[in-house]
């Protein structure tokens, strides 16, 4: 583990994490809305 990580790599990892969280949020909302409309 590096003591001083590359800030560019860190920002890319943060963007990737936020992207995955956004996709997960859209996926969960899609399931909730589909179950609400088809029920």
UniProtKB/Swiss-Prot annotation:
Gene Ontology CC, one term: photosystem II reaction center
Which top-level group of life is the source organism from?
A: Bacteria
Give compartment(s). Cellular thylakoid membrane
- Keyword Thylakoid part of the UniProt annotation: yes
Q: Which Pfam families match?
A: PsbL
Q: Which InterPro entries match?
A: PSII_PsbL, PSII_PsbL_sf
Query: Which segments cross the bilayer?
Result: 18-38
Does the keyword Thylakoid feature in the UniProt annotation?
A: yes
A GO BP entry is: photosynthesis
Question: What function does the entry list?
Answer: One of the components of the core complex of photosystem II (PSII). PSII is a light-driven water:plastoquinone oxidoreductase that uses light energy to abstract electrons from H(2)O, generating O(2) and a proton gradient subsequently used for ATP formation. It consists of a core antenna complex that captures photons, and an electron transfer chain that converts photonic excitation into a charge separation. This subunit is found at the monomer-monomer interface and is required for correct PSII assembly and/or dimerization.
Describe the subunit structure.
PSII is composed of 1 copy each of membrane proteins PsbA, PsbB, PsbC, PsbD, PsbE, PsbF, PsbH, PsbI, PsbJ, PsbK, PsbL, PsbM, PsbT, PsbX, PsbY, Psb30/Ycf12, peripheral proteins PsbO, CyanoQ (PsbQ), PsbU, PsbV and a large number of cofactors. It forms dimeric complexes.
By sequence similarity, the record places it as follows: Belongs to the PsbL family.
Q: What is this protein called?
A: Photosystem II reaction center protein L
């Amino acid at each position: 583990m590096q003591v001083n990580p590359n800030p560019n790599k860190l920002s890319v990892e943060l963007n990737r994490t936020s992207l995955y969280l956004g996709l997960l949020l859209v996926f969960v909302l899609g399931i909730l809305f589909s179950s609400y409309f088809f029920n």
